[in-house]
């Protein structure tokens, strides 16, 4: 049997969960890497599919792999869902936040680690823009452009996540 909650009960539950999540994330992230007020989280309410919007409890903006792991561990301990997000340019709702969850922005992971023209491969972090990959590969006569119209903004992590 599913229990139905009143709007006030749901809001109260959301407020409590948000407070718990923020307290836990403050322990593992620098102050500038965590946002939760409505004004600052508005850009994270949707991806390129703007017809549907949901505000997350908070947005984590980690800068290191250790911080990503700490965010995931903290959220798991609280039972808080996490939605990973790159540039948010997708049109399928793949980066749609969970209203009782945390959005994990991976945009700061934007380094190109290696371009190997012989094997025609690139080792990049998930937040690298498609255009940056093409620019790094251009001196070798190579490019990466599965979707040239959005390559200035979309990221390789989003390409992989959305099977672009």
Residues covered by each model-derived region:
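Conserved PLP cofactor-binding pocket of PLP-dependent enzymes
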Residues: 85
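Short glycine-biased active-site loop of nucleotidyltransferases that positions the nucleotide triphosphate
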Residues: 48-51, 93-98
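Short clusters of hydrophobic/aromatic residues that line enzyme substrate/ligand-binding pockets
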Residues: 34, 41-44, 91, 112, ...
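N-terminal glycine-rich flavin-associated loop
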Residues: 25, 51-82, 100, 106-148, ...
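Beta-rich nucleic-acid/ligand-interaction surfaces
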Residues: 153-155
């Amino acid at each position: 049997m599913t229990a139905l909650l009143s709007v006030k009960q749901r809001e109260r539950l959301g407020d409590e969960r948000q407070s718990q999540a923020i307290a836990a994330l403050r322990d593992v992230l620098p102050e500038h890497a965590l946002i939760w007020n409505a004004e600052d989280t508005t850009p994270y309410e949707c991806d390129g599919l703007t017809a549907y919007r949901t505000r997350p409890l908070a947005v984590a903006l980690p800068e290191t792999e250790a911080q990503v792991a700490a965010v995931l561990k903290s959220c798991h301990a609280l039972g808080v869902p996490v939605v990973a997000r790159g540039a948010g340019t997708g049109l399928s709702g793949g980066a749609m936040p969970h209203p009782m969850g945390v959005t994990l922005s991976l945009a700061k992971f934007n380094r190109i680690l290696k371009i190997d023209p012989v094997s025609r491969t690139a080792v990049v972090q998930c937040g690298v823009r498609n255009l940056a990959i093409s620019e790094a590969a251009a001196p070798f006569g190579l490019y990466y452009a599965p979707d040239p119209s959005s390559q200035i903004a979309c990221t390789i992590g989003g390409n992989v996540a959305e099977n672009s």
